[in-house]
């Protein structure tokens, strides 16, 4: 963690928080599905949590945004000079943008929205730390898209297209290749779905006008870490902020579900089907309280429930064939969930220390701890 920070991180004076990883819900036994909301709701019901907040999951990149009211505030509170009014950094503490002008314009737009909504006066603060998702996915994952997903898609479509053509010719010539042709046609179709799945989350970025930022947590302001407020409060408060610049800021749709009420559960499941049916990644299910305790102690701060087409990007074009799905259902979540809880606790503790004006080294004990945990081996598909 220390090596990564020393070689790649942004100015460490900005790094007061790193977000935790997130576990998926338990594996579903619904036909043809690996993940389904039923398991997410069942987890929280088992833990004694009655009400959950379901938020649309954006397919972008996690971003922590710190905005100061002025450069003087950045100097006085963060000890940073000559770097503008804030920063946008990744979940591993690296600067999100290589283009400093693009970052500066993004931060300026967010500050203007905060000005318009009277945020500084409402919260009696001169700075804010926001937890966000920045879209498109391709703005940060361009190399991954080109060298992993697009390369696989292009090679597969080319090879399978040629194979299907040859098999069709063989069939026309009277060869017994019917089963083989069906198999390769299925593979070709699934590869096409794979390509369409990742294309949905990519578009060119030439300026800040091509970006969308979806803030979902007000993490901290001058004298407070806002973990004492429920997720619905965060959603509603940030939705008001997003109205001040709807071209850049995206309010996250959400739905409150009572996990003990059948009709409420059905509405939550139907909403998930609606989100994934139009190409969305899925949803994140959280207990209504920011910090919640259940039968086993601290419960997962969030679990993700992803749609079948998005999972095609993660597990490969043919993941949902019956023989593959049965194998994938054996995945284990224990390690991922343990990491999520520890990283969540460290993240909040780091913010609390910063708000209490403890020395930066004390804040960085928590920040570096999160980064160290993230270096532990765990299935990256979870």
Question: Over which residues does each language-model region extend?
Answer:
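Low-complexity, highly charged intrinsically disordered N-terminal segments
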Residues: 1-39
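Short, hydrophobic/amphipathic alpha-helical patches that form generic packing surfaces
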Residues: 3, 131-137, 214-223
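Short linear interaction motifs
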Residues: 31-50, 107-123, 138, 264-266
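Nucleic-acid 5′ end/cap handling module spanning
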Residues: 34-90, 182-382
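Short acidic, glycine/serine/threonine-rich loops at helix termini
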Residues: 66-69, 100-101, 141-147, 295-296
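Conserved loop->alpha-helix
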Residues: 80-136
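Short acidic, S/G/P-rich loop/turn micro-motifs used as interaction or catalytic elements
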Residues: 95, 135-139, 290-292, 320-321
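Non-catalytic, alpha-helical, charged scaffold/linker segments
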Residues: 114-210
């Amino acid at each position: 963690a220390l090596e990564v920070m020393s070689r790649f991180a942004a100015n460490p004076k900005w790094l007061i928080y790193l977000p935790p990883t997130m576990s998926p819900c338990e594996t579903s036994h619904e036909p043809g599905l690996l993940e389904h909301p039923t398991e997410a709701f069942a987890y929280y019901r088992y833990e004694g949590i009655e009400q959950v907040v379901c938020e649309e999951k954006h397919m972008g990149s996690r971003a922590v945004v710190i905005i100061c009211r002025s450069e003087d505030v950045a100097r006085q509170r963060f000890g940073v000079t000559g770097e503008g009014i804030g920063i946008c950094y990744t979940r591993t503490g690296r600067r999100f943008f290589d283009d400093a002008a693009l970052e500066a314009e993004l931060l300026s737009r967010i500050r203007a929205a905060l000005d318009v909504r009277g945020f500084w006066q409402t919260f009696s603060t001169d700075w804010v730390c926001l937890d966000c998702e920045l879209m498109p996915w391709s703005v940060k994952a361009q190399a991954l898209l080109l060298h992993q997903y697009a390369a696989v898609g292009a090679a597969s479509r080319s090879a399978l297209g040629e194979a299907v053509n040859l098999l069709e010719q063989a069939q026309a010539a009277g060869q017994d290749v019917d089963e083989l042709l069906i198999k390769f046609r299925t593979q070709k179709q699934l590869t096409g779905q794979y390509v369409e799945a990742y294309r949905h989350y990519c578009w060119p970025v030439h300026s800040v006008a091509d970006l969308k930022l979806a803030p979902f947590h007000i993490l901290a302001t001058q004298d407070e870490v806002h973990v004492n407020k429920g997720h619905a409060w965060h959603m509603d408060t940030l939705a008001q902020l997003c109205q001040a610049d709807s071209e850049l800021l995206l309010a996250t749709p959400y739905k409150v579900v009572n996990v003990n009420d059948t009709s409420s559960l059905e509405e939550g499941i139907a909403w998930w089907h609606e989100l994934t049916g139009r190409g969305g990644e899925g949803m994140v299910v959280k207990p209504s309280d920011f910090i919640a305790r259940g039968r086993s102690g601290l419960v997962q701060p969030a679990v993700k429930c992803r749609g079948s087409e998005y999972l095609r990007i993660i597990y490969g074009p043919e993941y949902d064939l019956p023989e593959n799905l049965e194998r994938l259902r054996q995945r284990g979540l224990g390690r991922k969930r343990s990491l999520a809880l520890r990283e969540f606790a460290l993240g909040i503790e780091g913010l609390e220390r910063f708000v209490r004006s403890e020395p930066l080294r004390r804040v960085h004990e928590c920040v570096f701890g999160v980064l160290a945990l993230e270096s532990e081996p765990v299935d990256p598909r979870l």
